[in-house]
Amino acid sequence: YIIGAELEGIIGSLINPAHRTQGWHSTGTVGVIGAAAAIGALRGLHGESLAQLLSLAATQSAGMFFQSGTDGKPLHAGLAARNGVWAYELLQHTSLQTSTKPFDPERGWFKTIGNITVTSNDIASRWLAPGQLIDPGLWMKVHPYCSAAICGAEAAETVAHRIYTSSSYVSKHYNVSPDAEEQDQCRLCATPDFSFWEDIDRVTVHFPPGADAALRYTTPSTGREGQFSIEYIVYQVLAYGAVQDELFKIDIIDQEVRDCMSRIERVYDLPKVSQSERITK
């Protein structure tokens, strides 16, 4: 596992963000190579045997970001794992021979996929120094939506908390004096508050230039598309008090919800983020 994650992480750091910008989904394109590396380490492969395994995996490298908002995107992970295993089985049980130079600087995987030159030293110098599982480390999603929406969702949660624990809101809807923690929890369990939206003219979500590229749906029609829509995510937070994971599974988003989302706009007035950074909070 460590070996597979290490190679996958290093490759990802060398080709992204350009790889993503070109429309590739690295879970599929890089994941298959990581899977093969993990299998090779598990089976004790070295030299030519390992090179052929990585070669056969690399030639199956695929996964395109136009699948975002569909079941095709998470399927990339399964296909990458399957193809890594299949590459190993083919080489073990057939007489198949493959190139032993999948990462040749002049015409190998990096040159073909990313049009960049990467040498063996570029990988070796990064190998376990200190290790991809240590730096940058593993990061797990709490909710099933695109990570590009995390900051916007957290900002919306702050706004929602202030609104739903305010004296005016609590008095109007609960006819009791406000207790911030208690009333906030009450909102988390409540049905969506569309009356709240009657008082909203516009919700503005601020981004650095290009930081919302993965959030491709401004008016999603399904829950799956909503995973890649800051509008749908912010709507959930403001209507319920928190993101509702079940809403990403619905087949059709109601018109009333779409009307609320139409009041959410994006502006690009925040400082540009370094291409090597990934904002997670």
Question: What is each residue range found by the language model?
Answer:
Residues G72-R82, E89-K281:
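Terminal-appendage/accessory-domain detector
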